[in-house]
Design a protein with these regions (language model features):
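Short, Lys/Arg-enriched N-terminal segment that forms or immediately precedes the first helix
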Residues: 5-26
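Beta-hairpin "wing" of winged helix-turn-helix
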Residues: 76-93
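Short capping segments at the starts of secondary-structure elements
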Residues: 40-49
């Protein structure tokens, strides 16, 4: 039977290396909602574009498609989002674009301070 145990650390330098390059951290629903709002405060986006942007802007973080869709559904139920389709020349079918309601911007802005603080606290250690 194969073991899925992590390799043992052989010295303190290995543990230090862990903090230099920690494993990716997956966002839960609350953090995913904040990520979606942070992006949509800047401009409209399509869901897979949000995933690509997270990977680019915060490579230490991960967001599953399932949790992303739960976050979008949550925001739609809160009546904070509009959706529309946009045709892109590079794609055959139109994209489902997400747009933050103008009257939801204040609520979204209130979450940006704790979201930014969380990002700062969970940023990789650099030396």
């Amino acid at each position: 039977m194969l073991s899925h145990r992590k390799p043992t650390r052989t010295c303190l330098a290995d543990i230090e290396d862990y903090f230099q390059q920690p494993p990716p951290q997956f966002l839960d629903l609350e953090l995913a909602v904040c990520w979606v709002l942070a992006c949509l405060l800047q401009n409209d986006s399509y869901p897979s574009g949000l995933l690509q942007r997270l990977q680019h802007d915060h490579p230490q973080l991960r967001l599953s498609e399932t949790v992303l869709h739960q976050a979008v559904d949550f925001l739609e139920r809160q009546e904070m989002l509009d959706c529309y389709t946009k045709r892109c020349p590079s794609r055959g079918r139109p994209r489902r674009m997400l747009h933050l309601h103008q009257d939801a911007r204040d609520q979204a802005e209130r979450l940006m301070k704790p979201w930014t603080r969380w990002l700062h606290e969970h940023a990789p250690i650099t030396t």
